[in-house]
Swiss-Prot record:
Its main location: secreted. This is Carbohydrate-binding domain-containing protein C2E1P3.05c. Residues 1-23 form the signal peptide. Disulfide bonds join C33-C50, C44-C60, C76-C93, C87-C103. GO terms for cellular component: cell surface; extracellular region. Residues 25-61, 68-104 form the CBM1 domain. SUPFAM superfamilies: Cellulose-binding domain. Transmembrane segments: none annotated. Keywords: Disulfide bond, Glycoprotein, Repeat, Secreted, Signal. Residues 115-163 are annotated as: Disordered. It is found in: Secreted. One of its GO terms (molecular function) is cellulose binding.
Length: 197
């Protein structure tokens, strides 16, 4: 009887060591459990499940997790991200790189946006990426250079300049400040031609 009792004790001890070793090799709650180039454990500790977010990232989420999903345009995944990986209704978690996924509305199609969104985008684009160099030339040897956000300008200015800069050329609601390189000269009476590229 002593032998059978000793055998059961050793067997129980061995099984508990094996299960502890297996559990310690699994990812903890909210830990990474999968993804391209991920070389860590792909199992999760008891009480959580490995949830796929995108090809680069899967995370151990508690089975009893009842927390809120990420709101529209919030982060919903990525390497070292420890937050909700689900998105509120009407949006989905879109992969934007290995470190960032974001909740994007399901019905957004970049090619068909509303007119107000289009004009907002156009306005932003005009101020940040449609920058061109404009040169004013005249028959006199001095020239004036400026940078403008107006895509193209063709106009004539025929007034005197006595300060170092002036505002002119209002086209489609945009105005630009042109800086003079020679402030002692006046504009010729025939005018300066302003062209933009």
């Amino acid at each position: 009887m002593l032998t059978q009792s000793l055998f059961l004790t050793v067997l129980t001890l061995a099984l508990s060591l094996v299960s502890k070793t297996s559990a310690s090799q699994c990812s903890p709650r909210y830990g990474t459990c999968g993804g391209i180039y991920y070389d860590g454990p792909t199992c999760c500790v008891v009480g959580s499940s490995c949830i796929y977010s995108n090809p680069w990232y899967s995370q151990c989420i508690p089975v009893d997790y009842t927390g809120p999903c990420a709101k529209l345009y919030q982060q919903c995944g990525g390497i070292n991200y420890n937050g909700p990986t689900c998105c509120e209704p009407g949006s989905e978690c879109i992969y934007n790189g290995p470190y960032y996924s974001q909740c994007i509305p399901v019905d957004i199609d970049p090619s068909s946006s509303s007119s107000s969104a289009a004009s907002s985008t156009t306005s932003t684009t005009s101020s940040s990426s449609l920058v061109s160099s404009t040169t004013l030339t005249s028959s006199s040897p001095s020239a004036v250079s400026s940078t403008t956000s107006i895509p193209s300008i063709s106009s004539t200015i025929s007034s005197s300049v006595s300060t170092s800069s002036f505002t002119s050329l209002s086209s489609s609601g945009f105005s630009t400040v042109l800086s003079s390189t020679n402030t002692t000269s006046a504009l010729p009476s025939s005018g300066w031609n302003v062209t933009g590229y």
